[in-house]
Design a protein with these regions (language model features):
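Assembly/oligomerization scaffold segments
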Residues: 21, 35, 94-95
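Bacterial N-terminal signal peptides
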Residues: 26-34
Length: 356
C-alpha cells in the first residue's frame, strides 16, 4: 500500500524513515519478549499472543522463583502461536482468537482461557489526553475504512463538542501479523458497522483498507508513540506502559466507560462459559452500562495426547499455579482474573480432555 495515500506529504518522509528504524525491532519483538534467552530441554515452551505477554511474563518470573522451573515464551502474535502448536514446536500456543470446536477436534487440541483484558484505541494527537476523546464503534470503523480521514471531521466533532480537534490527517495504525487482538478488534467493528462487516469482516489477519502495520502490540504502540496524529489499538497494559492516551468508546448501552479492570469485569460478567463448548466464547460489544466494548480473553491451546507427556504435565502445573495463585499479579496489570468457578471448570476440563 502506498504510504503517501495515508498521510500528508509532511509526514510521509518521516514515516518512511521510521519504518526502516522500526522494522528490525518489530520483527524481533518475539525474541525480545521471550521469557528466557534460550530453552533448555526442561523448559516449558509457548508462543503466541502479545495481548497476554505482560501478565504471562510476571507469572513466569514468580513461578521460577518458587519452583525453579522456567517458561520460554515467544510473544509473536496469536497467528504465530497457533502455527507453532500445530507444528508441535512448543508445548502450548496462546491465542486471543479461540479455535472453533470442530477445528480443535480435527487437530487433536484442547483450549482453555487464561485471563480477561481489554483492547483500547490509543492516539497521538497534540493536546488530547486519555479519556478526553470519545468515539462510537461506527466512527472507529469509518476511520479504519478510510471514510473519516481528518481529526476535525464532523463525525468526530459532533461526538466531542468543545474539544479542540486539529485539521490534520488521521494516521491509521493496525497489526501486520496474525493477531488475536486484531480478531477481537475486527469482530467488534463488524458488530457495530455494516460496511465494515461486508467489506472487511473479522479475522486474525484482514485486508486493511488503510493504514500501516506494526508487528505485535509492541509494534503498534511504537508507531503510535512516534507518528503524529496517529490512532491504533493495543491491549490496555501496553497503553499504560507506553503512556499512550486512550480513547473512550461508546458501549452497547450507549455509555462511555473508562477502560479498567472494573469495565473489563463488567463485560465478562455475562459470559456463559458453561454453555461454551471448548470455551469458545467471544465477549465483544457485551451488554451492560459499565461494560468495556472490546473485552477479550486469551486461550492456551495444547495437544490432548501430547508426544511428550512430561512436558505437558509441566505446562499444566504452571497453568494451575497461575490460575490459582496469580490473581494479584493479573489485577495489578489491569487484567481480570478468572473467577474460582471458572477455574474449577477449566481444571475439570483438563481431567476430562487431556491424556498423559
Amino acid at each position: 500500500m502506498v504510504l503517501a495515500s495515508l498521510f500528508f506529504k509532511s509526514t510521509r518522509d518521516a514515516l518512511h524513515m521510521l519504518t526502516k528504524k522500526l522494522l528490525s525491532a518489530c520483527l524481533g519483538a518475539g525474541l525480545v519478549a521471550a521469557l528466557a534467552v534460550s530453552a533448555s530441554a526442561a523448559d516449558i515452551t509457548g508462543a503466541g499472543s502479545t495481548f497476554v505477554y505482560p501478565v504471562l511474563s510476571k507469572w513466569s518470573a514468580d513461578y521460577n522463583k518458587q519452583t525453579g522451573d522456567k517458561l520460554n515464551y515467544q510473544s509473536i502474535g496469536s497467528g504465530g502461536g497457533i502455527a507453532q502448536i500445530k507444528a508441535a514446536t512448543v508445548d502450548f500456543g496462546a491465542s486471543d482468537a479461540p479455535m472453533k470446536p470442530e477445528d480443535l477436534t480435527t487437530g487433536g487440541f484442547g483450549q482453555f482461557p487464561l485471563v480477561v483484558g481489554g483492547i483500547v484505541p490509543v492516539i497521538n494527537v497534540k493536546g488530547i489526553k486519555s479519556g478526553e476523546l470519545k468515539l462510537t464503534g461506527k466512527v472507529l470503523a469509518d476511520i479504519y475504512l478510510g471514510n473519516v480521514t481528518k481529526w476535525n471531521d464532523k463525525a468526530i466533532a459532533d461526538l466531542n463538542p468543545g474539544l479542540k480537534l486539529p485539521d490534520s490527517q488521521i494516521a491509521v495504525v493496525h497489526r501486520s501479523d496474525g493477531s488475536g487482538t486484531s480478531f477481537n478488534w475486527t469482530n467488534y467493528l463488524s458488530k457495530v458497522n455494516e460496511d465494515w462487516k461486508s467489506k472487511v469482516g473479522e479475522g486474525t489477519a484482514v485486508n486493511w483498507p488503510v493504514g500501516i502495520g506494526g508487528k505485535g502490540n509492541e509494534g503498534v504502540a511504537a508507531y503510535v508513540t512516534r507518528v503524529k496524529d496517529s490512532i491504533g489499538y493495543v491491549e490496555y497494559a501496553y497503553a499504560l506502559q507506553n503512556k499512550l492516551p486512550y480513547v473512550l468508546i461508546q458501549n452497547a448501552a450507549g455509555q462511555y466507560p473508562k477502560p479498567n479492570a472494573e469495565s473489563f469485569s463488567a463485560a465478562a460478567a455475562g459470559a456463559e462459559w458453561t454453555k461454551a463448548p471448548d470455551f469458545y466464547l467471544i465477549m465483544t460489544n457485551a451488554p451492560g452500562e459499565k461494560a468495556w466494548p472490546v473485552t477479550a480473553t486469551t486461550w492456551a491451546i495444547m495437544y490432548k495426547e501430547p508426544k511428550d507427556a512430561a512436558r505437558s504435565k509441566a505446562a499444566f502445573a504452571f497453568f494451575k499455579w497461575a490460575l490459582e495463585n496469580g490473581q494479584k499479579e493479573a489485577s495489578a496489570l489491569d487484567y481480570v482474573p478468572l473467577p474460582e468457578t471458572l477455574v474449577k471448570q477449566i481444571e475439570d476440563y483438563w481431567t476430562a480432555s487431556f491424556k498423559g
